[in-house]
Amino acid sequence: MKLRMNRREFGIGTATAIAALSAFPTFAGGKLKVAGIYTVPTQQKWVARLHLALDAAAKRGEIDYVYSESTANTDYVRVMREYCDSGVNMIVGEAFGISKEARKVADDYENIAFLMGDPFKPHGNNFSVFDNYIHEPCFLMGILAGEMSKTKKLGMVGGYAIGEVNRLFHAFMDGAKSMNPECEFKVTYIGSWYDPPKAKEAAFAQIEAG
């Protein structure tokens, strides 16, 4: 079953992951066995919504849930395959940095459902994708920043220079320019999805630079 979810179906609220699970049939062997694989700690907000929803479903007895957090992209495929070999029915996670590799795993395990955060299209019959649309609130943030800024200089700190991050930055810049076309922007990438001290350091460096 191919499934692509928009922002109203997936991405906000603790029920999102459970809504995704309902798209798949009940397994004859009993409860659905779900594995979550996350590249950041589960307290990171983007991942937290998935983790909390799946954990709540497990506590209600609806699914069996295991997970791995802070899994590097270089180790992600190995972890995927280990969970597949362990007998899970479904893997939920992120494929932003390993889109092709994750799809290859799905090809090798056709009886397992994959629900992955990913900007590209679904793949085969068992690889479904979701994404968020937070470029829209980023545009609104830009409007506020462009209106409030006295220096016309605005800074942005992101994880990696990839399309999913840059679309947020461009939305922010478009919003700011809609209020003040003379705004200038400083962008810093910290090379991590979750490193609060490094993000703070980058932000202060931008402030000191004006």
Task: List each language-model region with its residue ranges.
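Structural motif
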Residues: 65-84, 191-207
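Extracytoplasmic "Venus flytrap"
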Residues: 33-60, 66-76, 96, 161-167
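N-terminal secretory signal peptides and thylakoid transit peptides that target proteins
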Residues: 2-18
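Short beta-strand elements at the ligand-binding edges of bilobed clamshell
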Residues: 122-147, 156-164
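C-terminal segment of N-terminal export signals and the immediately downstream linker at the start
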Residues: 3, 24-37
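A short helix->loop->beta-strand "cap" motif at the edges of active sites that frequently abuts
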Residues: 110-112
